[in-house]
Amino acid sequence: MSIRNELLEQILTATAGGGGSSGTNGFIDYNDTSTTSSPVVLNGGVWTSIPNNGLGAFTNKAYSPSGVTELMDTSNGALDLSELALGDTILVRNDYTITPSTNNSLLEFRYTLGAGGGLYTLEKIIGRLDSGSGIGYRRSLLPDLIYMGDTNTLDNPIGLEVRLSASGVLVNAGSAIQVIRQ
């Protein structure tokens, strides 16, 4: 067995199959319906919150982490990680479609975390939407990692926002949130 395979075996053994304590990890998938018939209007250059009511047919709470009932506030679409513990980590896979009114619009995404003087953001450039205007660009399958390193992150809502350089609309399919316990 190669050194790489031996190391992988040691990691998997130490983490009970690859992710913390056995039986405590899991996920909840929140499927949105609020934007299906009324897409979110995006004004060029303005950060806009992504709603998620969790009422979609594909919402799945059957595999939630042990001791966790919710990971999202479905009244506003913000992540609510107050049932987690310091040291826990989440992977978030967001699935949404942006339809720009102008070709070559720049799309950015961010999480807003913390509160008050401790407010901070995690931002990323998604890219240019350059296949034409008036067509939907679906963004999914790119997970983001957020760890609970302090109570400012753990105890406050985490907002999901997009910014498009031109006007457009957003339809949210939902967010799957995987919990990895310390």
Model-derived features with residue positions:
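Short, intrinsically disordered N-terminal pre-domain segments
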Residues: 1-16, 27, 181-182
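Extracellular jelly-roll beta-sandwich "head" domains, especially the C-terminal globular C1q domain
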Residues: 20-85, 89-182
